[in-house]
Amino acid sequence: MTVPDKRKDLMIVNMGPQHPSMHGVLRLIVTLDGEDVIDCEPVLGYLHRGMEKIAENRTIIQYLPYVTRWDYLATMFTEAITVNAPEQLGNIQVPKRASYIRVIMLELSRIASHLLWLGPFMADIGAQTPFFYIFRERELIYDLFEAATGMRMMHNFFRIGGVAADLPHGWIDKCLDFCDYFLTGVVEYQKLITRNPIFLERVEGVGIIGGEEAINWGLSGPMLRASGIPWDLRKVDHYESYDEFDWEIQWQKEGDSLARYLVRINEMIESIKIIQQVLEGIPGGPYENLEVRRFARPKDSEWNDFEYRFISKKPSPSFELSKQELYVRVEAPKGELGVFLIGDNSVFPWRWKIRPPGFINLQILPQLVKRMKLADIMTILGSIDIIMGEVDR
């Protein structure tokens, strides 16, 4: 009987695009030597829908329903960046009450996004229980969204100069109750997960990124803050009303998958602190800037002499973008979400360039997984937190 020689050649494996741990239609072409990862090549584009080109043929208000399909788990942030760009371009003032309502919605959306990151991340590394736990709190957030906006996910709530509607009666008390309840839920997560020896074995020291390396790769959000760089656009850019509240930037210096987990867990607690302060100090007044609805110039034949300003009370397609360029960014749950806008004295943007955080953060994946074990790919990819709708646009 002859014993066959061991094969020495490498194995190439496709992970995705249909794979339960891929977080969307991401395909990884992985080169393996046994269990060791030699190379990894991400293949993108399976969810490309031409979002930037669509923006060039829509007014801002017409485009708002599209943007909620970028990062469909944190839709308030895509709406915020879409209205912030023309607001800054046209120097439009947002009423204080509208700004406070926006902050509440953004932070609730941040918590919902982090929760739906935590559950699948834990499932990827073998812990099924938190996956079911996170839906309790997330469902309460979606109930609040539904009461305020009418929709659970694709809210279409932000408007140029404010928000679509005021908070309904009793909503503030309901939200305060949620904040008190959620803090106990986070304590439960920390007891279940943070010191679990099996969890620590899977994430500690896995996927380490140094601070300088994170900056060179252009990383942002929890990916950057977990590498020892306390950089948060809410503190840096002073947008909305974040300067009026007392909160801290959450960061860790280790740079591994555990650090990225800790940053996100602590960020949820900080978001609750911000929401509680907003709810206690929310002022009265209008929830949108009525001046935005006016024509900036007399009507012309561009709209076939149809009087658009009387269609409804919301900003009409006649809102013009002046001939200048602007880059606007917000601190989304996954990192820096930015839009580069070029106006052309038209109701349509001449160029609408999206800077999605997931697309930039995903670039470092091949470097992180090389020389690691095959099972570590899921841990590292899960700790990056990507949504393919925003990566492929």
From Swiss-Prot:
PROSITE patterns: COMPLEX1_49K. NDH shuttles electrons from NAD(P)H:plastoquinone, via FMN and iron-sulfur (Fe-S) centers, to quinones in the photosynthetic chain and possibly in a chloroplast respiratory chain. The immediate electron acceptor for the enzyme in this species is believed to be plastoquinone. Couples the redox reaction to proton translocation, and thus conserves the redox energy in a proton gradient. This is NAD(P)H-quinone oxidoreductase subunit H, chloroplastic. SUPFAM superfamilies: HydB/Nqo4-like. NCBIfam families: PRK06075.1 (NF004739), PRK07415.1 (NF005649). HAMAP family: NDH1_NuoD (MF_01358). One of its GO terms (cellular component) is chloroplast thylakoid membrane. Belongs to the complex I 49 kDa subunit family. Gene3D superfamilies: Cytochrome-c3 Hydrogenase, chain B. GO terms for biological process: photosynthesis, light reaction. InterPro entries: NADH_Q_OxRdtase_suD (IPR001135), NADH_UbQ_OxRdtase_49kDa_CS (IPR014029), NDH1_su_D/H (IPR022885), NiFe-Hase_large (IPR029014). It is an enzyme of class 7 (translocase). Keywords: Chloroplast, Membrane, NAD, NADP, Plastid, Plastoquinone, Quinone, Thylakoid, Translocase, Transport. GO terms for molecular function: NAD binding; oxidoreductase activity, acting on NAD(P)H, quinone or similar compound as acceptor; quinone binding.
